Amino acid sequence: MTHNRLFSAIAFTFILLLAFSCKKKEDKVEYNYLNGTPKFSIPAYVQPGEVYVLHPREVTRPSDDTSTDGIGYYWSVSPITTKKDTVRTEKDAASVSADYTLTIPDTLCTITTTCSAFAEGYYSSTSEASSIIVKPYGEDRSLKGITYPDKSKVITDSRDSKKYYYTTAAGLDWFVENLAFEGAGKPFLDSPAMADIFGMFYTWNEAAKACPAGWRLPSNEDFLALHNSLTGAKNTAAKTTFYGNMGDCMADAYLNDIKLWEFWPGVNINNKTGLAMIPAGYATINEDGNARYYGSTYYYTCWTSDEAGSDKAYYRYVYADKPDMLLGSGSKTDFASPVRCVRTSE
């Protein structure tokens, strides 16, 4: 009898749990979906002090929704903010802005900005974008590992007052960093904060006239002389690959403490020349003038002054896994590369 009672109690409990579980499923609320996502635009790299007014794409209720309420929006920026910032509620008039003003703080980190559109009875619609905060200038700048052999060797570009250190190699003065003149070209990933870190990316037509007065693009002959000075060779063929010793021109640089050149045992990065080549990569330009960027952390590229026919020009590049300087050619209008400027040594 006792066993029967125990069995009955267990069975009764199981039935109750099953009934409760079914009821929970029956009570589960299903929401509808809003139309669209609140997408917005912010550069992939930003710098302290910049102010961005972020404008989300409009989100709407389904066409069969007869409610007179609107759509609410809230924002958050991790790890900067810990609370959601509601800029518009459902009851607000449509004229109330859903925009969000973001001021970039003075710190080095990756921030994730999130915008959510919400309405009662609907799942929230969310969009997010990540940005890396970098510091282009100062002792705590993001780009580390660039050395200036002689700090007295510096020029000021009269067009924008930017300063460039230079070093002397093979009878020429060479910029130690990529040209950052913003009167032409595009910054890396279309992020103005990167102009003074990776330099600007120029088409050859832009690069041909981008250097400051008294400076010019290096020729293949200039790169040949540079390589001969490194190897002691007496090569005379300028339009070819130069083998070996390019680690003498590469800088073991870091961006926000992230190593730029990937390590390869066959490449001895030591920057003996002070040229401080870094792997900023290259870009292609489509017919609408928009750029796509490739090869950062893998390629150093630099335009030469030499044309390769009516619509192409030569550029030099160094790949992470080889101590060589290779030769390529690209469209004068659709291929974009950083630039180093040279002049005859004074």
Where do the language-model regions lie?
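Exposed beta-strand face motif in extracellular beta-rich ectodomains
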Residues: 107-113
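Conserved structural position at the C-terminal beta-strand
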Residues: 117-119
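Conserved positions within compact, well-structured domain cores
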Residues: 137-346
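Solvent-exposed loop segments of extracellular immunoglobulin-like
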Residues: 60-74
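Sec-dependent bacterial lipoprotein signal peptides
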Residues: 1-21
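Coil residues (strongly favoring Ser/Thr
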Residues: 24, 41, 65-66, 85-86, ...
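Surface-exposed, flexible coil segments in extracellular/virion-facing regions
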Residues: 74-102
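Bacterial Sec-dependent N-terminal signal peptides
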Residues: 16-45, 121-124, 128-152, 294, ...
